């Protein structure tokens, strides 16, 4: 199933998601295409959030912003509908996670603005092409994600700590992994830390704040990349009336080819 899904087109995956036939994490799916995180908030907060993303481009690289009231990401995936095409969503009310759903159409408002934020799943195929293993794909689980003590630059009501994703990499390949991913700044780029998780406030790799723990083997080093789940941690601090996000690991498959995001 994994290999079959990796060969699908973005539209094929989105159709499965839209029909409710695929509700799990999207790592490895439509492998040549960029995946996106989601934040939906009301128009009166959209400028401050866009400013937050501009000031924090490492964790929050913006791939597309919808027109107010429109669920169509006209640049990233013109045939998509952000209300139905993510496998799972989270509803936050006053900073508290209250619901997890597979369709946000009932929650959609005429002044809602959707932000698509780059996802590190998008550079995983480039790592695989360099024979660098991706443990969460191999183990069939969600990527582990952790809150750090790295401060984001505030904007309006939005402030908080960066969230990172972690992939165990053989020590001899860690520098190569950094080189490969540095080509993709639109989907988080180079790592923010190689090894020493305590230095960024992570005390236990076996207890991720989001996603699932993975095996770190002898001779491997944990490598951390800025993560598009950062807005969810920030939203918990800002406590707006309602914000909708993707569920961590459950992304939109866009029509943007991964290689088109590479800078070298």
UniProtKB/Swiss-Prot annotation:
Coiled coil: none annotated. InterPro entries: D-Glu_cyclase, Putative_hydro-lyase, UPF0317. Gene3D superfamilies: PSTPO5379-like, PSTPO5379-like domain. GO terms for molecular function: lyase activity. The keyword Lipid biosynthesis does not apply. The keyword Repressor does not apply. Keywords: Lyase. It is an enzyme of class 4 (lyase). It comes from the Bacteria. Its EC number is 4.2.1.-. Belongs to the D-glutamate cyclase family. NCBIfam families: PRK05463.1 (NF003969). This is Putative hydro-lyase RBAM_004300. The lineage of its organism: Bacteria, Bacillati, Bacillota, Bacilli, Bacillales.
């Amino acid at each position: 199933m994994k290999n079959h899904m990796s060969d699908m087109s973005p539209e094929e995956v989105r159709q499965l998601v839209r029909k409710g036939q695929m509700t799990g994490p999207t790592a490895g799916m439509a492998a040549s295409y960029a995946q996106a995180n989601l934040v939906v908030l009301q128009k009166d907060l959209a400028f401050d959030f866009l400013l937050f993303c501009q000031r924090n481009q490492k964790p929050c690289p913006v791939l597309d912003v919808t027109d107010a009231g429109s669920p169509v990401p006209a640049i990233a995936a013109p045939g998509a509908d952000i209300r139905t095409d993510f496998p799972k969503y989270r509803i936050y009310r006053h900073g508290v996670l209250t619901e997890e759903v597979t369709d946000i159409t009932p929650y959609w408002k005429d002044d809602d603005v959707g932000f698509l934020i780059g996802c590190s799943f998008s550079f995983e195929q480039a790592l695989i092409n360099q024979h660098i293993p991706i443990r969460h794909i191999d183990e069939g689980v969600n990527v582990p994600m952790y809150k750090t003590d790295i401060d984001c630059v505030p904007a309006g009501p939005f402030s908080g700590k960066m969230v990172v994703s972690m992939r165990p990499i053989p020590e001899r390949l860690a520098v190569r992994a950094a080189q490969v991913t540095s080509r993709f700044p639109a989907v988080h780029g180079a790592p923010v830390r190689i090894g020493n998780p305590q230095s960024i406030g992570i005390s236990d790799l076996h207890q991720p704040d989001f996603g699932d723990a993975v095996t770190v083997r002898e001779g491997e080093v944990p490598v951390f990349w800025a993560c598009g789940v950062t807005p969810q941690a920030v939203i918990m601090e800002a406590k707006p009336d309602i914000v909708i996000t993707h569920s961590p690991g459950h992304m939109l498959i866009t029509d943007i080819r991964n290689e088109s995001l590479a800078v070298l």
